[in-house]
Amino acid sequence: MQRQLRVAVALASLGFALAGAQPLLRADEKSSVEEIRKELLQLPYYGVFDFLAFSYDKGTVTLMGYAYHSTLKHDAARGAKRASGVDQVIDKIEELPVSQFDDELRWRTYYAIYRDPFLSRYAPGGGMLRGHRHRFGGGFHAMRLRRFPGMEPVGDYPLHIIVNHGKITLLGVVDTESDKTVAGLRAREVPGSFGVENELVVEGSKPKSTRE
């Protein structure tokens, strides 16, 4: 089934705390945003341990997020440049350091969350109805992304697990506050971490970031 792409881009540089109307995108700008999103989603090594977000403004794409795979940062910039209407790409993606300790922590956290009976339906091939996709858009609006304000997130996995020097950050979108709470608890139960930041957004509600 083809990906259903919903465009919810805010060009404001500040987050949801600022008041004011969201500028409307022209048809050609919307087309460019869709192409950028498609290029990033098709990156072969973009997965659950990475997180990408972007903004588009008058031909300039700004990329942010975290890259676990060694070539993802370069591939994301190259992919964004292929989209129509893109004149310049500013690549601010942070490359995560190579660390066996972090790798072990990533996989322990992955299994703790995606194999949990309460959360396993979010895993690829889990209990969701065929064709159901937790895509970023709609309830997970660009203006609501606390870590990257004004950026449009991209991803297939609903819960992305970022590990950096032993610190775990959960990014993504879930259905309910209970799902967010359980995901944070499971991550906190993983031995060896130096802290957990639960930045999951509950679809359709105002996000709350909690440090556990």
Task: Describe every region a protein language model picked out.
Residues Q2-A12, F16-E212:
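N-terminal targeting leaders
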